[in-house]
Protein backbone atom coordinates (compact mmCIF):
# COMPACT_ATOMS: atom_id res chain seq x y z
CA UNK A 1 0.00 0.00 0.00
CA UNK A 2 2.74 2.46 0.97
CA UNK A 3 4.73 1.63 -2.13
CA UNK A 4 1.62 2.17 -4.27
CA UNK A 5 1.08 5.57 -2.70
CA UNK A 6 4.67 6.57 -3.29
CA UNK A 7 4.48 5.56 -6.95
CA UNK A 8 1.21 7.38 -7.40
CA UNK A 9 2.64 10.50 -5.82
CA UNK A 10 5.13 10.75 -8.66
CA UNK A 11 2.22 10.93 -11.08
CA UNK A 12 0.71 13.95 -9.33
CA UNK A 13 -1.28 12.33 -6.55
CA UNK A 14 -0.78 13.92 -3.10
CA UNK A 15 2.17 12.62 -1.12
CA UNK A 16 0.79 11.62 2.27
CA UNK A 17 -1.88 14.25 1.76
CA UNK A 18 0.64 17.11 2.00
CA UNK A 19 2.61 17.56 -1.23
CA UNK A 20 2.18 17.05 -4.95
CA UNK A 21 5.39 15.97 -6.66
CA UNK A 22 6.25 17.62 -9.97
CA UNK A 23 9.20 17.52 -12.32
CA UNK A 24 12.47 15.78 -11.55
CA UNK A 25 15.17 18.27 -10.53
CA UNK A 26 18.08 15.87 -10.19
CA UNK A 27 19.15 12.38 -9.26
CA UNK A 28 21.98 10.67 -7.46
CA UNK A 29 22.95 7.08 -6.74
CA UNK A 30 20.40 6.66 -3.97
CA UNK A 31 18.06 9.64 -4.28
CA UNK A 32 15.91 11.66 -6.63
CA UNK A 33 14.93 15.27 -6.02
CA UNK A 34 11.57 16.57 -7.21
CA UNK A 35 9.98 19.98 -7.45
CA UNK A 36 6.86 19.79 -5.29
CA UNK A 37 3.82 21.88 -4.48
CA UNK A 38 2.60 22.08 -0.93
CA UNK A 39 -1.14 21.54 -0.56
CA UNK A 40 -1.25 24.08 2.28
CA UNK A 41 -2.84 27.35 1.10
CA UNK A 42 -0.29 30.02 0.20
CA UNK A 43 2.74 27.81 0.86
CA UNK A 44 5.87 28.16 -1.25
CA UNK A 45 6.99 25.32 -3.54
CA UNK A 46 9.55 22.95 -2.05
CA UNK A 47 12.10 20.35 -3.09
CA UNK A 48 11.49 16.76 -2.01
CA UNK A 49 14.40 14.35 -1.84
CA UNK A 50 13.12 10.79 -2.26
CA UNK A 51 15.21 7.89 -0.97
CA UNK A 52 14.41 4.23 -1.47
CA UNK A 53 14.68 2.24 1.76
CA UNK A 54 15.62 -1.09 0.10
CA UNK A 55 18.40 0.64 -1.85
CA UNK A 56 19.72 2.22 1.35
CA UNK A 57 19.66 -1.14 3.10
CA UNK A 58 21.46 -2.83 0.21
CA UNK A 59 24.17 -0.16 0.29
CA UNK A 60 25.04 -1.05 3.87
CA UNK A 61 24.86 0.77 7.16
CA UNK A 62 27.09 3.59 5.95
CA UNK A 63 24.53 5.04 3.56
CA UNK A 64 21.71 4.93 6.09
CA UNK A 65 24.00 6.60 8.63
CA UNK A 66 24.73 9.34 6.12
CA UNK A 67 21.02 10.08 5.69
CA UNK A 68 20.49 10.16 9.45
CA UNK A 69 23.50 12.45 9.83
CA UNK A 70 22.15 14.80 7.16
CA UNK A 71 18.79 15.04 8.91
CA UNK A 72 20.37 15.53 12.34
CA UNK A 73 22.63 18.31 11.06
CA UNK A 74 19.97 20.20 9.12
CA UNK A 75 17.49 20.05 11.98
CA UNK A 76 19.82 22.04 14.22
CA UNK A 77 20.56 24.70 11.58
CA UNK A 78 18.40 27.69 10.65
CA UNK A 79 20.27 30.37 8.76
CA UNK A 80 19.47 32.42 5.63
CA UNK A 81 22.37 30.79 3.77
CA UNK A 82 21.78 27.20 4.85
CA UNK A 83 19.24 25.12 2.94
CA UNK A 84 16.32 24.55 5.29
CA UNK A 85 14.89 21.13 6.05
CA UNK A 86 11.14 21.55 6.56
CA UNK A 87 10.20 18.02 7.57
CA UNK A 88 10.90 14.31 7.11
CA UNK A 89 8.20 11.91 5.92
CA UNK A 90 8.35 8.16 5.43
CA UNK A 91 6.38 5.21 4.15
CA UNK A 92 7.27 1.53 4.26
CA UNK A 93 9.52 1.82 1.23
CA UNK A 94 10.48 5.50 0.93
CA UNK A 95 11.97 8.36 2.91
CA UNK A 96 11.08 11.92 1.92
CA UNK A 97 13.17 14.93 2.93
CA UNK A 98 11.09 18.06 2.33
CA UNK A 99 13.50 20.95 1.85
CA UNK A 100 13.65 24.55 0.81
CA UNK A 101 13.62 24.99 -2.97
CA UNK A 102 16.71 26.55 -4.56
CA UNK A 103 15.66 27.18 -8.18
CA UNK A 104 18.91 28.91 -9.14
CA UNK A 105 20.83 25.65 -9.39
CA UNK A 106 24.29 25.12 -7.94
CA UNK A 107 27.26 27.47 -7.89
CA UNK A 108 29.35 25.25 -10.18
CA UNK A 109 26.72 25.38 -12.92
CA UNK A 110 26.36 29.13 -12.50
CA UNK A 111 30.13 29.64 -12.88
CA UNK A 112 30.24 27.27 -15.85
CA UNK A 113 27.63 29.41 -17.62
CA UNK A 114 29.92 32.46 -17.50
CA UNK A 115 32.37 33.00 -20.38
CA UNK A 116 35.31 33.45 -18.00
CA UNK A 117 33.99 30.85 -15.50
CA UNK A 118 34.81 33.29 -12.70
CA UNK A 119 33.35 36.31 -10.91
CA UNK A 120 34.58 39.89 -10.65
CA UNK A 121 36.26 40.38 -7.30
CA UNK A 122 33.47 42.51 -5.84
CA UNK A 123 30.93 39.84 -6.79
CA UNK A 124 33.16 37.11 -5.37
CA UNK A 125 33.22 39.04 -2.08
CA UNK A 126 29.44 38.94 -1.83
CA UNK A 127 29.29 35.22 -2.62
CA UNK A 128 32.08 34.45 -0.18
CA UNK A 129 30.42 36.55 2.51
CA UNK A 130 27.31 34.40 2.39
CA UNK A 131 29.26 31.14 2.33
CA UNK A 132 31.39 32.10 5.31
CA UNK A 133 28.42 33.48 7.23
CA UNK A 134 26.72 30.09 6.87
CA UNK A 135 29.81 28.14 7.96
CA UNK A 136 30.48 30.37 10.97
CA UNK A 137 26.92 29.63 12.03
CA UNK A 138 27.33 25.88 11.45
CA UNK A 139 30.62 25.69 13.35
CA UNK A 140 29.17 27.64 16.27
CA UNK A 141 26.55 24.90 16.54
CA UNK A 142 29.02 22.06 16.40
CA UNK A 143 28.47 21.13 12.74
CA UNK A 144 31.43 20.72 10.37
CA UNK A 145 30.27 20.29 6.78
CA UNK A 146 33.29 18.34 5.45
CA UNK A 147 32.18 18.49 1.80
CA UNK A 148 32.13 22.20 0.99
CA UNK A 149 32.30 22.58 -2.79
CA UNK A 150 30.44 24.56 -5.48
CA UNK A 151 28.16 21.60 -6.27
CA UNK A 152 26.85 21.74 -2.68
CA UNK A 153 26.28 25.49 -2.73
CA UNK A 154 22.84 26.19 -4.20
CA UNK A 155 21.26 29.48 -5.27
CA UNK A 156 17.75 30.72 -4.62
CA UNK A 157 15.65 32.72 -7.08
CA UNK A 158 17.44 35.93 -6.04
CA UNK A 159 20.98 34.57 -6.29
CA UNK A 160 21.49 34.10 -2.55
CA UNK A 161 23.57 31.13 -1.45
CA UNK A 162 22.20 28.05 0.30
CA UNK A 163 24.74 25.57 1.67
CA UNK A 164 23.34 22.06 1.19
CA UNK A 165 24.15 18.34 1.38
CA UNK A 166 25.10 17.68 4.98
CA UNK A 167 25.42 13.93 4.45
CA UNK A 168 29.10 13.97 5.43
CA UNK A 169 28.69 16.53 8.20
CA UNK A 170 30.34 15.87 11.56
CA UNK A 171 28.40 16.52 14.75
CA UNK A 172 29.90 16.77 18.25
CA UNK A 173 29.34 13.05 18.85
CA UNK A 174 31.59 12.31 15.85
CA UNK A 175 34.68 13.47 17.72
CA UNK A 176 37.10 10.91 19.13
CA UNK A 177 38.62 11.08 22.60
CA UNK A 178 41.32 13.40 21.27
CA UNK A 179 38.64 15.91 20.24
CA UNK A 180 39.34 15.40 16.54
CA UNK A 181 37.82 13.71 13.53
CA UNK A 182 39.42 10.67 11.93
CA UNK A 183 37.19 9.77 8.98
CA UNK A 184 38.61 10.78 5.60
CA UNK A 185 35.76 12.07 3.47
CA UNK A 186 34.81 14.78 1.02
CA UNK A 187 35.82 15.59 -2.55
CA UNK A 188 39.61 15.35 -3.11
CA UNK A 189 39.97 18.62 -5.05
CA UNK A 190 38.38 20.51 -2.12
CA UNK A 191 39.61 18.38 0.80
CA UNK A 192 42.34 19.60 3.13
CA UNK A 193 45.77 17.88 2.93
CA UNK A 194 45.43 16.42 6.43
CA UNK A 195 42.15 14.80 5.39
CA UNK A 196 43.65 13.35 2.21
CA UNK A 197 46.55 11.94 4.24
CA UNK A 198 44.07 10.32 6.65
CA UNK A 199 45.37 12.14 9.70
CA UNK A 200 43.30 13.29 12.66
CA UNK A 201 41.90 16.72 11.86
CA UNK A 202 39.78 19.64 13.01
CA UNK A 203 36.54 19.76 11.01
CA UNK A 204 36.26 23.54 11.07
CA UNK A 205 39.85 23.96 9.84
CA UNK A 206 39.16 21.43 7.07
CA UNK A 207 36.13 23.52 6.02
CA UNK A 208 38.40 26.59 6.00
CA UNK A 209 40.67 24.91 3.44
CA UNK A 210 37.63 24.11 1.28
CA UNK A 211 36.62 27.78 1.51
CA UNK A 212 40.06 28.71 0.23
CA UNK A 213 39.65 26.44 -2.78
CA UNK A 214 36.22 27.91 -3.52
CA UNK A 215 37.55 31.46 -3.22
CA UNK A 216 40.35 30.57 -5.63
CA UNK A 217 37.78 29.16 -8.09
CA UNK A 218 35.60 32.27 -7.78
CA UNK A 219 38.55 34.55 -8.54
CA UNK A 220 40.50 32.47 -11.07
CA UNK A 221 37.89 30.31 -12.79
CA UNK A 222 39.73 27.03 -12.22
CA UNK A 223 40.95 24.78 -9.40
CA UNK A 224 44.23 25.57 -7.61
CA UNK A 225 45.22 21.90 -7.47
CA UNK A 226 43.84 19.68 -10.21
CA UNK A 227 45.37 16.27 -10.71
CA UNK A 228 43.82 12.86 -11.32
CA UNK A 229 46.45 11.39 -9.00
CA UNK A 230 45.43 12.22 -5.44
CA UNK A 231 48.96 11.74 -4.10
CA UNK A 232 50.34 14.23 -6.63
CA UNK A 233 47.54 16.68 -5.87
CA UNK A 234 48.25 16.42 -2.15
CA UNK A 235 51.95 17.02 -2.83
CA UNK A 236 51.12 20.17 -4.81
CA UNK A 237 48.92 21.40 -2.00
CA UNK A 238 51.71 20.93 0.55
CA UNK A 239 54.13 22.81 -1.68
CA UNK A 240 51.53 25.51 -2.41
CA UNK A 241 52.00 25.00 -6.13
CA UNK A 242 49.24 27.27 -7.37
CA UNK A 243 49.18 30.57 -9.24
CA UNK A 244 46.48 33.22 -9.06
CA UNK A 245 45.89 35.37 -12.17
CA UNK A 246 47.46 38.82 -12.22
CA UNK A 247 44.09 40.60 -11.92
CA UNK A 248 43.50 39.32 -8.36
CA UNK A 249 44.17 42.02 -5.75
CA UNK A 250 46.87 41.69 -3.12
CA UNK A 251 44.41 41.48 -0.17
CA UNK A 252 42.59 38.65 -1.93
CA UNK A 253 45.88 36.87 -2.64
CA UNK A 254 46.86 37.08 1.01
CA UNK A 255 43.50 35.69 2.06
CA UNK A 256 43.78 32.73 -0.31
CA UNK A 257 47.28 32.09 1.01
CA UNK A 258 46.07 32.08 4.62
CA UNK A 259 43.25 29.66 3.81
CA UNK A 260 45.33 27.34 1.61
CA UNK A 261 47.89 26.89 4.35
CA UNK A 262 48.81 23.16 4.48
CA UNK A 263 49.47 23.49 8.21
CA UNK A 264 46.06 23.45 9.95
CA UNK A 265 47.58 24.98 13.09
CA UNK A 266 48.43 28.21 11.26
CA UNK A 267 45.61 28.10 8.71
CA UNK A 268 43.10 30.92 9.03
CA UNK A 269 39.91 29.70 10.70
CA UNK A 270 36.54 30.55 9.19
CA UNK A 271 35.59 32.44 12.35
CA UNK A 272 38.70 34.62 11.96
CA UNK A 273 37.84 35.81 8.47
CA UNK A 274 36.06 38.92 9.74
CA UNK A 275 39.43 40.34 10.82
CA UNK A 276 41.02 40.00 7.37
CA UNK A 277 41.25 43.29 5.42
CA UNK A 278 39.73 41.88 2.22
CA UNK A 279 36.86 40.15 3.94
CA UNK A 280 36.30 42.87 6.51
CA UNK A 281 35.30 45.24 3.73
CA UNK A 282 32.59 42.88 2.55
CA UNK A 283 31.31 42.45 6.09
CA UNK A 284 30.91 46.19 6.50
CA UNK A 285 27.55 47.89 6.42
CA UNK A 286 28.63 49.83 3.35
CA UNK A 287 29.42 46.72 1.32
CA UNK A 288 26.37 44.72 2.41
CA UNK A 289 23.84 47.44 1.66
CA UNK A 290 25.60 48.36 -1.56
CA UNK A 291 25.47 44.84 -2.98
CA UNK A 292 22.04 43.93 -1.62
CA UNK A 293 20.18 47.15 -2.41
CA UNK A 294 22.11 48.53 -5.34
CA UNK A 295 21.97 52.07 -3.97
CA UNK A 296 24.36 54.39 -2.19
CA UNK A 297 24.69 52.86 1.29
CA UNK A 298 25.38 54.69 4.47
CA UNK A 299 29.07 55.33 4.98
CA UNK A 300 28.92 54.47 8.67
CA UNK A 301 26.70 54.23 11.71
CA UNK A 302 27.12 57.68 13.22
CA UNK A 303 27.54 57.62 16.98
CA UNK A 304 25.61 60.74 17.90
CA UNK A 305 24.72 61.47 21.50
CA UNK A 306 21.73 59.24 22.32
CA UNK A 307 18.59 61.23 23.21
CA UNK A 308 17.68 61.18 26.91
CA UNK A 309 14.66 59.18 28.04
CA UNK A 310 11.62 61.07 29.28
CA UNK A 311 9.90 60.41 32.59
CA UNK A 312 7.44 57.91 31.12
CA UNK A 313 10.26 55.87 29.60
CA UNK A 314 12.12 55.69 32.91
CA UNK A 315 8.98 54.83 34.92
CA UNK A 316 8.16 52.03 32.48
CA UNK A 317 11.51 50.45 33.36
CA UNK A 318 10.75 50.33 37.07
CA UNK A 319 10.49 46.98 38.89
CA UNK A 320 6.97 45.59 38.96
CA UNK A 321 5.67 47.66 36.04
CA UNK A 322 5.45 45.62 32.84
CA UNK A 323 3.85 47.48 29.94
CA UNK A 324 4.47 44.77 27.34
CA UNK A 325 0.78 43.90 27.29
CA UNK A 326 0.04 47.26 25.67
CA UNK A 327 1.82 46.10 22.51
CA UNK A 328 0.71 43.45 20.02
CA UNK A 329 2.26 40.00 19.98
CA UNK A 330 3.84 40.66 16.58
CA UNK A 331 5.58 43.77 17.87
CA UNK A 332 6.91 41.91 20.90
CA UNK A 333 8.39 39.26 18.61
CA UNK A 334 9.96 41.84 16.29
CA UNK A 335 11.39 44.17 18.92
CA UNK A 336 13.61 43.71 21.97
CA UNK A 337 15.50 46.13 24.16
CA UNK A 338 18.23 45.97 26.73
CA UNK A 339 20.14 48.23 29.08
CA UNK A 340 23.90 48.53 28.72
CA UNK A 341 26.79 50.43 30.25
CA UNK A 342 29.02 49.60 27.27
CA UNK A 343 29.96 52.32 24.79
CA UNK A 344 27.92 52.73 21.58
CA UNK A 345 30.93 51.60 19.55
CA UNK A 346 31.37 48.47 21.65
CA UNK A 347 27.66 47.66 21.51
CA UNK A 348 27.48 47.94 17.72
CA UNK A 349 30.69 45.92 17.34
CA UNK A 350 29.27 43.06 19.40
CA UNK A 351 25.94 43.19 17.55
CA UNK A 352 27.83 42.92 14.26
CA UNK A 353 29.90 39.96 15.48
CA UNK A 354 26.73 38.21 16.65
CA UNK A 355 25.12 38.92 13.28
CA UNK A 356 27.85 37.01 11.45
CA UNK A 357 26.90 33.94 13.48
CA UNK A 358 23.12 34.32 13.64
CA UNK A 359 22.42 35.53 10.11
CA UNK A 360 21.51 39.21 10.35
CA UNK A 361 23.25 42.52 9.65
CA UNK A 362 22.90 45.95 11.23
CA UNK A 363 21.44 48.96 9.43
CA UNK A 364 20.98 52.57 10.45
CA UNK A 365 17.80 54.59 10.01
CA UNK A 366 18.65 55.59 6.43
CA UNK A 367 19.41 52.00 5.59
CA UNK A 368 15.97 50.94 6.89
CA UNK A 369 14.32 53.44 4.57
CA UNK A 370 16.02 51.80 1.57
CA UNK A 371 15.14 48.23 2.48
CA UNK A 372 12.70 46.76 -0.08
CA UNK A 373 9.26 45.82 1.20
CA UNK A 374 9.12 42.14 2.06
CA UNK A 375 12.69 41.87 3.24
CA UNK A 376 15.97 40.88 1.62
CA UNK A 377 15.32 37.42 0.23
CA UNK A 378 15.43 35.84 3.68
CA UNK A 379 18.29 37.93 5.03
CA UNK A 380 17.51 39.68 8.28
CA UNK A 381 18.27 43.35 8.76
CA UNK A 382 18.22 44.70 12.30
CA UNK A 383 17.95 48.36 13.20
CA UNK A 384 19.10 49.81 16.51
CA UNK A 385 18.27 52.94 18.47
CA UNK A 386 20.02 54.09 21.65
CA UNK A 387 18.57 56.34 24.36
CA UNK A 388 20.38 57.70 27.38
CA UNK A 389 19.09 56.50 30.76
CA UNK A 390 21.92 58.16 32.66
CA UNK A 391 25.37 59.45 31.67
CA UNK A 392 26.75 55.93 32.04
CA UNK A 393 23.73 53.85 31.01
CA UNK A 394 21.82 53.49 27.73
CA UNK A 395 18.69 51.73 26.56
CA UNK A 396 19.22 49.86 23.27
CA UNK A 397 16.15 49.07 21.17
CA UNK A 398 16.44 46.44 18.44
CA UNK A 399 13.98 45.81 15.64
CA UNK A 400 13.91 43.19 12.89
CA UNK A 401 13.48 44.93 9.53
CA UNK A 402 13.91 42.10 7.02
CA UNK A 403 13.67 38.36 6.47
CA UNK A 404 9.88 38.41 5.90
CA UNK A 405 8.57 34.93 5.24
CA UNK A 406 5.27 36.18 3.92
CA UNK A 407 3.34 36.44 7.19
CA UNK A 408 4.19 40.09 7.74
CA UNK A 409 6.16 39.24 10.82
CA UNK A 410 9.63 39.45 9.28
CA UNK A 411 10.60 35.96 10.44
CA UNK A 412 10.51 37.30 14.00
CA UNK A 413 8.82 34.27 15.47
CA UNK A 414 11.80 32.12 14.50
CA UNK A 415 14.54 34.63 15.29
CA UNK A 416 16.87 33.48 18.06
CA UNK A 417 16.62 36.35 20.53
CA UNK A 418 17.97 34.19 23.36
CA UNK A 419 20.93 33.22 21.17
CA UNK A 420 21.56 36.89 20.45
CA UNK A 421 21.52 37.69 24.15
CA UNK A 422 24.03 34.91 24.82
CA UNK A 423 26.32 36.14 22.01
CA UNK A 424 26.30 39.71 23.34
CA UNK A 425 27.29 38.51 26.82
CA UNK A 426 26.77 39.92 30.27
CA UNK A 427 29.44 42.56 29.72
CA UNK A 428 27.15 44.23 27.17
CA UNK A 429 23.66 43.23 28.32
CA UNK A 430 22.88 44.55 31.79
CA UNK A 431 19.13 43.88 31.62
CA UNK A 432 17.08 42.34 28.80
CA UNK A 433 13.40 42.74 28.01
CA UNK A 434 11.21 39.75 27.24
CA UNK A 435 13.52 36.83 28.07
CA UNK A 436 12.88 36.28 31.76
CA UNK A 437 9.12 35.84 31.84
CA UNK A 438 8.63 39.10 33.71
CA UNK A 439 11.15 38.34 36.43
CA UNK A 440 13.52 40.93 37.77
CA UNK A 441 16.80 41.03 35.90
CA UNK A 442 20.22 41.99 37.18
CA UNK A 443 20.63 45.21 39.12
CA UNK A 444 16.91 45.25 39.96
CA UNK A 445 15.88 46.68 36.58
CA UNK A 446 12.86 45.23 34.85
CA UNK A 447 12.48 46.01 31.16
Swiss-Prot record:
Q: What induces it?
A: By salt stress and abscisic acid (ABA).
Write one Gene Ontology MF term.
Answer: protein serine/threonine kinase activity
Which domain of life, per UniProt?
Eukaryota
Q: What is its EC number?
A: 2.7.11.1
> Domain NAF spans what residues?
297-328
Cite the residue spans of the region called PPI: 333-362
Q: Which cofactor does it need?
A: Mn(2+)
Q: Where is the Protein kinase domain?
A: 19-279
Binding positions for ATP per the UniProt entry: 25-33, 49
Task: Give the matching InterPro entries.
Answer: Kinase-like_dom_sf, NAF/FISL_domain, NAF_dom, Prot_kinase_dom, Protein_kinase_ATP_BS, Ser/Thr_kinase_AS
SMART domains from the entry? S_TKc
Keyword hit for Kinase: yes
Name the Pfam families for this protein: NAF, Pkinase
Q: Which UniProt keywords apply?
A: ATP-binding, Kinase, Manganese, Nucleotide-binding, Serine/threonine-protein kinase, Transferase
The residues annotated as the active site are 147 (proton acceptor)
Which chemical reaction does it catalyze? L-seryl-[protein] + ATP = O-phospho-L-seryl-[protein] + ADP + H(+); L-threonyl-[protein] + ATP = O-phospho-L-threonyl-[protein] + ADP + H(+)
Q: Locate the region Activation loop.
A: 165-194
Q: What class of enzyme is it?
A: transferase
Q: What does this protein do?
A: CIPK serine-threonine protein kinases interact with CBL proteins. Binding of a CBL protein to the regulatory NAF domain of CIPK protein lead to the activation of the kinase in a calcium-dependent manner.
Family according to the record: Belongs to the protein kinase superfamily. CAMK Ser/Thr protein kinase family. SNF1 subfamily.
Q: What is known of its domains?
A: The activation loop within the kinase domain is the target of phosphorylation/activation by upstream protein kinases. The PPI motif mediates the interaction with the ABI (abscisic acid-insensitive) phosphatases.
Query: What is the name of this protein?
Result: CBL-interacting protein kinase 7
Protein source organism: Oryza sativa subsp. japonica (Rice)
Q: Encoded by which gene?
A: CIPK7
Amino acid sequence: MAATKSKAAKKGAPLLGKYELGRLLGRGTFAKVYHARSLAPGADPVAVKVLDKPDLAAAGAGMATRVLREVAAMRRLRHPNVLRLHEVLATRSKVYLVMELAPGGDLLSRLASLPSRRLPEHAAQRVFLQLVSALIYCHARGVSHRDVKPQNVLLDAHGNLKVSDFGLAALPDSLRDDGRLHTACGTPAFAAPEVLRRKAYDGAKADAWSCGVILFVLLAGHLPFDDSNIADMCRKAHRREYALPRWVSQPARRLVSRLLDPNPATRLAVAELATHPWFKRSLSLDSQLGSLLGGQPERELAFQAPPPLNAFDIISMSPGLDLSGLFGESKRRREKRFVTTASPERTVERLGQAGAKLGYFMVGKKGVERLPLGGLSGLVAMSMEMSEVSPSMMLVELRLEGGDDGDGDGGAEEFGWEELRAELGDDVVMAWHGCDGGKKDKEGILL
